[in-house]
Amino acid sequence: MKKYLAKSKLKSVYVENGKATKVFAKTYNKSDVLYEALNTSRVEDAGVNIPKLLEVAVTDGKWSITSEYVEGPTLTQLIEKYPDKADDYIKKMVEYQISFQKKSNPLLLVLKDKMNRQINSIEELDNSVKYELLTRLNSMKNHTKLCHGDYCPDNIIVTADAKGNIKEITAVDWVHATQGNASADIANTFLLLKLQFGDKSDIPEKYISAFCELTNTKRSYVNEWLPLVAAARLTKNKEAVSYTHLTLPTIA
C-alpha cells in the first residue's frame, strides 16, 4: 500500500514495499530527472553510504526514481521535538558532512564551474558586482571534495533512540552534488540554516563553529565563500539576496 510522504505540483514521494519512489509531473524536464539519478549513482560510486538508487522508470508519461527507503525522522523534526539536544544534533550533522567530504568522484560537476554559470545568469546583480564575485571565485582554491549542494536538516534522515539520541544519520536529495571546496559547501549550508531558522537562531553559528573546530579551518576562510554561495543561490531562492552583502564590501 502506498504511503505518500510529500506532494507538490511538480513531484510527489511515496513509500511502498520498503522502497521510496519520487514521481515527477509530465511537464518535468526528462533530462533533469536523469541528471538527478546519475548524480545519485555517482555519489554511491564515491563510497558514500546513502539510500541506493534502484530504478528509473516512466509510467503514463511520468518519470520516476525509486531508491531504498530509510525510515526515520528528518533532522528538522528531531530538532523540533528535542530542542535541548540541538547542540549534539548539529555536531552529528557536521561530522557526517565531514565524512562524505573526504570522498570524491571525478565525474561530478565541478562546483566552481557551476557557480560561475549561476552568478553570470543572475539578473538581480549588476555587472560590477558580478565581476567582483567572479574575481573572488576564480581566486579560491580548487578542491575535489564531495559537496552535497543542498545539505540541510530537511535532507538529513536519522535513526534515533527513544530519548532522541542519534544512532545513524544519512542524507538524501543529492541532485546538486558536485566536486569542490568543502568550505563552499559549509557556507552554503550556513546560508540554508539562516533561511530555515532565521537570524535570531544560534543554530547557524553553532554549525559553522563546529565545522571550523573539528577541521581546524579558519572562520575567515569560510566567510570568503558566503557572498559567492549567496549569489549562486539566487538562481533558486530569491530570499538569499539579503545575504549577498555578508562580505561583499571587502571584495577587492
Give the predicted meaning of each segment.
Residues 76-111:
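Conserved kinase catalytic-core helix
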Residues 185-215, 230-241:
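Active-site activation/catalytic loop segments of kinase-like enzymes and analogous catalytic loops
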Residues 102-149, 153, 157-162, 166:
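An alpha-helical support segment within catalytic cores of ATP-dependent transferases
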Residues 244-250:
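Conserved small/polar residues in nucleotide/adenosyl-binding loops
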Residues 62-73:
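Conserved short submotifs of the Hanks-type protein kinase catalytic core
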